[in-house]
Amino acid sequence: MPTETYSKLSQLHYHVDKHGKKKATKKINKALEGTDYSLEKLKRGVAVYRHKDGSSLVNVKGTDITNKKDILSDIKLGLGLSKHDKQFSSRRKQIKDHMKNEDANSVTLVGHSLGGSIVTSAMAKSKSIRDNVKSAEVFNTGYTKEFGKELSKGLKKEDKSLLKQKLIHNHTEGD
């Protein structure tokens, strides 16, 4: 799938902050008309899109600057303390729960900003996610030296190699 498609699907998820779940669902479904995707599940932090070929895309939404939990998560990641953050752990669990019902290598993970950091962390810290996800593509991921140290702790050479194969970081201007 093209990077542009992933970026658009990720951006649609932000409707949940602006409009609430019910109205956001309508707006997202309207935006998806005529595409190869449908919205399967929508939560504030995680959305699942289903492709017409049966594969799925799990998007982890980024920071809502009006949400204190998001700001706290950003601070913890900046300090290399994301392992103590409830949003990091709950969204990783949501990803794992979704993947339990999917064929291996049929799930793509996508995230923007804080969501990109959570996807990156999930890939680094969960062998089951790392081994079974098809790919992960993230946009303008929040990243610091301390977060990097936290993520690389305990990773073997082959884990790092697999991350390089499956995880693509995109940096866009004006975000």
Language-model region placement:
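Acidic catalytic loop of the alpha/beta-hydrolase fold
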Residues: 172-175
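Serine-hydrolase-like catalytic core of hydrolytic proteins
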Residues: 118, 140-143
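Gly/Ala-rich beta-loop-alpha elbow adjacent to hydrolase catalytic centers
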Residues: 111-115, 119
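Short glycine-enriched nucleophile-adjacent loop
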Residues: 119-128
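A conserved cap/lid and substrate-binding interface adjacent to the catalytic center
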Residues: 5-110, 127-135, 142-153, 161, ...
